[in-house]
């Protein structure tokens, strides 16, 4: 979720190999298959007064690649974003349009914290968004399937 230490996927995978970690994978322009599901996603983008078009298009492209890879598996797709692309009346159309184009109907996300927002349920144009920030789920793992 807060992967500020991320450098490159190649370096991260080398670290896993060097340390013999075989139960961890990274989603970066791809998907991961886990227990009969294709897990897809990207960081996404949050609403700013001045959005950065370069970052926004990059994140939309990464989500497109990840969901396309997930579709190729033929498995049900679980979609995760760090930033929600829908929050209240705000919609990040560049990201949301990728989700709609791929027929995704449930997206899990983090980023939002605080007691007042934890009970907010978000749905937009047939897509449900579920907030999984640690403080909003009492620091308890959430069973999602």
Model-derived regions, located:
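Gly/Ser/Thr-rich beta-alpha loop segments that engage phosphate groups in nucleotides
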Residues: 1-2, 43
């Amino acid at each position: 979720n807060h992967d500020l230490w991320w450098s490159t996927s190649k370096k991260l995978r080398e670290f896993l190999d060097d340390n013999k970690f075989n139960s961890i994978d990274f989603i970066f322009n791809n998907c991961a298959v886990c227990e009969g599901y294709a897990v897809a996603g990207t960081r996404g983008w949050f609403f700013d007064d001045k959005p950065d078009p370069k970052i926004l298009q990059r994140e939309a492209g990464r989500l497109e690649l990840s969901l396309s890879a997930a579709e190729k598996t033929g498995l049900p797709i679980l979609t995760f974003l760090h930033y929600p692309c829908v929050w209240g009346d705000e919609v990040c159309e560049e990201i949301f349009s990728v989700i709609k184009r791929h027929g995704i109907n449930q997206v899990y996300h983090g980023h939002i914290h605080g007691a007042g927002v934890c009970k907010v349920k978000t749905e937009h144009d047939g897509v449900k968004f579920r907030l999984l920030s640690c403080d909003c789920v009492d620091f308890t793992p959430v069973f999602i399937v």
